[in-house]
């Protein structure tokens, strides 16, 4: 009985750790995607600012 219980506990622990790792990886991917969008917005704003500053010269 002890052997089955420890195997079950180990499997359950492994499942929890695996699901947390999957969740953290999904959060990381989401964060990277948001940072790419943020960077693109900054580049666009900088480009528009450069265009307007060239028009005033």
Curated annotation (Swiss-Prot):
Source domain of life:
Eukaryota
Membrane association type: Single-pass membrane protein
Where does it sit, as one GO cellular component term? INA complex
Compartments in which it is found:
Membrane
Q: Where does the sequence pass through the membrane?
A: 10-27
Which parts of the chain are coiled coil? 28-55
Keywords for this entry? Coiled coil, Membrane, Transmembrane, Transmembrane helix
Which coarse location class applies to the principal site listed for this UniProt protein?
membrane
Please give a single GO biological process term from the UniProt record.
Answer: mitochondrial proton-transporting ATP synthase complex assembly
Q: What is this protein called?
A: Uncharacterized protein new9
Instruction: Identify the species of origin.
Output: Schizosaccharomyces pombe (strain 972 / ATCC 24843) (Fission yeast)
């Amino acid at each position: 009985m002890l052997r089955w219980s420890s195997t079950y506990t180990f499997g359950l622990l492994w499942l929890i750790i695996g699901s947390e790792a999957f969740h953290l990886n999904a959060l990381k991917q989401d964060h990277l995607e948001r940072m790419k969008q943020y960077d693109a917005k900054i580049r666009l704003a900088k480009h528009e600012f450069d265009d307007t500053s060239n028009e005033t010269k």
